[in-house]
């Protein structure tokens, strides 16, 4: 692949004294692994550009699973993520790294990712709606088709007041039992529209995406979730100290 294409760095790590190993999400080639030779050297003009959440144009080539970065240019400054939105962005990056196969094109998902990061950078409230929309988009691109609007058992439209149990590869069927795998018709309509007007529908969306993504993630926990769990108590402690001043 020798042409320029849009890209974001998902993760980077030292590869040698002067080089970086990059996990990159590109518009045309999907997720690729690149060696950025000389990127760690003091004279490199790439060091500042090869950071997560910086829109890039990249050109790379070579054979095998690991390609060589030929050129990279920052299209703009990094999207401004900090605090809870930074941890949310790291979660999205890790999700892509864990779920997408190498060099499989997901051009539409690339723009879903861009919109998610832009939404996180622009929010002054909760990042949850942007995260849930991206997770649902990711599931859709992976071929995880779910009909949220009809009962899998009867084919009837879902009723706001009824409860439905999710069954993998089948969909939602009416249920009299309420547990972690059940959702109201109101929840399912929110999932279908990807609009979450209240805390209850957001929580339901999070439950569903956790269930649906589990087969793709396996038993290995996400590092970003653990970092987020560590961040939240520290954030609360800082807020309490500020309020007590």
From Swiss-Prot:
The keyword DNA damage applies. InterPro entries: ARFGAP/RecO, DNA_rep/recomb_RecO_N, NA-bd_OB-fold, RecO, RecO_C. Keywords: DNA damage, DNA recombination, DNA repair. GO terms for cellular component: bacterial nucleoid. Belongs to the RecO family. Involved in DNA repair and RecF pathway recombination. The keyword Hydrolase does not apply. It comes from Klebsiella pneumoniae (strain 342). It comes from the Bacteria. This is DNA repair protein RecO. NCBIfam families: reco. GO terms for biological process: DNA recombination; double-strand break repair.
